[in-house]
């Protein structure tokens, strides 16, 4: 904790903000986030922004905000925690260069809104090259989200990193079942692990050449529990462990490639993903 950082809580409209801002966290829903960002940056100078995911609903907004951030020299990151999680970093390091495939499966875990965390993980551990949709087997039916006006998807799709590591994401909908446990399987030529992620705990079995070698349990902090440390580090060092805006933009637009055809067909929306 840095005792030199002083906090002040004030609730006001954007056009009432008069002081320049060191760090802004833009945590609206995806429909309003781009509009709010434009309004904020037209009113005051902002040094750093942390966006929440899912970033924006409309494809064109990604480039517009990218250009605006560049024009105003704003540093920006997106709150995707997985690639900097101690547990997930350790899992990737255990494989070294041996990793070939990651499979993520579960029930009602929010495929549309949460896949971007796993995309950033794949992106980070494979050198942040090009990401490509290899398979798209999403169900044609869309589901209403818990938030009015937003939707979820089920089915599966596969993304490939530039180095050839595959990420397979799958989700099924089971009515009246509020079980968002996720199973994660990572496979290499010699090594394999299977992990279960649920309620802030990751339980992981590591196997080497088909022989169980170890078991480890990790505590996974909620994003809200990590925010304070992220802000303090950014304030002290002018650096951030989260993916940059442009890295996250690339990942989101890959998801647009997967999702927007279904939303266009079902909701008659062009270039739009109503996910938050």
Predicted regions and their residues:
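NAD(P)-binding Rossmann-fold cofactor-contacting core
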Residues: 1-4
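Amphipathic, non-transmembrane alpha-helical secondary structure
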Residues: 15-18, 34-42, 89-92
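NAD(P)-dinucleotide binding in Rossmann-like oxidoreductases
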Residues: 150, 160-232, 239-246
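Rossmann-like NAD(P)H-binding beta-loop-alpha module
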Residues: 82-102
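Rossmann-like dinucleotide-binding domain that binds NAD(P)(H)
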Residues: 102-181, 246-250
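C-terminal helix-rich "cap/oligomerization" subdomain common to oxidoreductases
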Residues: 23-28, 232-276
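Short acidic low-complexity segments
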Residues: 7-20
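Beta-strand-loop-alpha-helix segment that lines the small-molecule cofactor/substrate pocket
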Residues: 23-26, 30, 34-81
